[in-house]
């Protein structure tokens, strides 16, 4: 853990934003958590509990919460954005004119920009300019487990090695390991695709197709990640690490995953709207399936599992029909010879 105790601003008071803010505060960093909901923010600041997203879990007394964005980012050494992907662009635009002189900006948002399919680091770079260090925080991590202090490993990929290391150092601690890398494309691709593939495994489990089917979907889903990664210039080892395989396994098997729970509900015959209403939080896969397939079509890559998820989410096919189509596909070599070259 770093000895530095510079102020850190965390933007976004959902479950993951709150968990990371609590982690940083416990590691001795003056941490301010910003949120839009005045009542929720006031409760966090007074009672040190996020009763909406992390009920019953005590937050550090030193953690402050505010709805004043300018006050949150003032004098911050760096800023951590933790909002849903659909709010990412707007949030970066809001903080851009308020930043102190060139602090780094990191984010734990996963996915692409909805509607354009752009990588989030491309969005941030366009808005913030060329001189601001950027980093993405990703990996297999449920907010509840992090807040409870259970062992977790994540990775921080950035375009500035010093900044990525500073973010990792601030997060690293006795039960939280933070690695570093410089493949932002691969790290963001893994974070986007795992949400879509988690729906597929959830559907299979909801239909009671067995553990063999779950393992097959996870493995072939990883294959889809690797093939798209190769096409867009990401490094395969990134997808074989925490940002890819690690996050994929967790999201496909852990019932704390909203995307897996969505798949479970669909596999049991619930409608999409009813399933989302029951989950009660943002489910990234609904928009990400479109953006993943946008990337795949742009690069001429076939992603049968991801495409089946997209079709099910749009109501174009039933889960049963999607399964039948996947099982009827022409067999091919498991991996193209060029995948790892």
From Swiss-Prot:
One of its GO terms (cellular component) is cytosol. It catalyses: sn-glycerol 3-phosphate + NAD(+) = dihydroxyacetone phosphate + NADH + H(+); sn-glycerol 3-phosphate + NADP(+) = dihydroxyacetone phosphate + NADPH + H(+). Sn-glycerol 3-phosphate binds at residues 110, 139, 141, 194, 247, 257-259. One of its GO terms (molecular function) is NAD binding. The active site is at 194 (proton acceptor). Disulfide bonds: none annotated. Transmembrane segments: none annotated. Pathway: Membrane lipid metabolism; glycerophospholipid metabolism. Keywords: Cytoplasm, Lipid biosynthesis, Lipid metabolism, NAD, NADP, Nucleotide-binding, Oxidoreductase, Phospholipid biosynthesis, Phospholipid metabolism. GO terms for biological process: carbohydrate metabolic process; glycerol-3-phosphate biosynthetic process; glycerol-3-phosphate catabolic process; glycerophospholipid biosynthetic process. Its main location: cytoplasm. It is found in: Cytoplasm. InterPro entries: 6-PGluconate_DH-like_C_sf, 6PGD_dom2, G3P_DH_NAD-dep, G3P_DH_NAD-dep_C, G3P_DH_NAD-dep_N, NAD(P)-bd_dom_sf. NADPH binds at residues 15-16, 36, 110, 143, 258, 282, 284. Belongs to the NAD-dependent glycerol-3-phosphate dehydrogenase family. Catalyzes the reduction of the glycolytic intermediate dihydroxyacetone phosphate (DHAP) to sn-glycerol 3-phosphate (G3P), the key precursor for phospholipid synthesis. This is Glycerol-3-phosphate dehydrogenase [NAD(P)+]. It comes from Xanthomonas oryzae pv. oryzae (strain KACC10331 / KXO85). The lineage of its organism: Bacteria, Pseudomonadati, Pseudomonadota, Gammaproteobacteria, Lysobacterales.
């Amino acid at each position: 853990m770093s000895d530095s105790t510079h102020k850190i601003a965390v933007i976004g008071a959902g479950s993951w934003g709150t968990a990371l803010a609590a982690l940083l505060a416990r590691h001795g960093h003056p941490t301010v958590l910003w949120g839009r909901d005045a009542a929720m923010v006031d409760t966090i600041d007074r009672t040190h509990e996020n009763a909406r997203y992390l009920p019953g879990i005590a937050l550090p007394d030193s953690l402050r919460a505010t709805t004043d964005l300018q006050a949150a980012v003032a004098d911050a050494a760096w800023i951590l954005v933790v909002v849903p992907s659909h709010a990412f662009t707007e949030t970066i635009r809001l903080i851009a004119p308020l930043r102190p002189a060139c602090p780094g900006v990191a984010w734990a948002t996963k996915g692409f920009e909805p509607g354009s399919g752009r990588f989030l680091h491309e969005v941030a770079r366009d808005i913030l300019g060329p001189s601001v260090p950027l980093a993405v925080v990703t990996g297999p991590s449920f907010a509840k487990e992090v807040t409870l202090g259970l062992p977790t490993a994540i990775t921080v990929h950035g375009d500035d090695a010093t900044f990525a290391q500073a973010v990792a150092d601030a997060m690293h601690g006795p039960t939280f390991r933070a690695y570093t890398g410089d493949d932002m494309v691969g790290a963001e691709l893994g974070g986007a695709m795992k949400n879509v593939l988690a729906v597929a495994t959830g559907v299979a489990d909801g239909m009671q197709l067995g553990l063999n089917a779950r393992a097959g979907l996870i493995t072939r889903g990883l294959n889809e990640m690797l093939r798209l990664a190769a096409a867009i210039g990401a490094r395969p080892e990134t997808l074989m690490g925490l940002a890819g395989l690690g996050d994929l396994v967790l999201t496909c098997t852990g019932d704390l995953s909203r995307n897996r729970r969505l798949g479970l509900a669909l596999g049991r015959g619930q409608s999409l709207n009813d399933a989302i209403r029951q989950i009660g939080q943002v489910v990234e896969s609904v928009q990400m399936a479109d953006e993943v397939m946008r990337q795949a079509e742009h690069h001429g890559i076939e992603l049968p599992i991801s495409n089946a998820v997209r079709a099910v989410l749009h109501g174009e096919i039933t889960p049963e029909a999607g399964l039948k189509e996947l099982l009827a596909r022409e067999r091919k070599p498991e991996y193209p010879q060029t995948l790892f070259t």
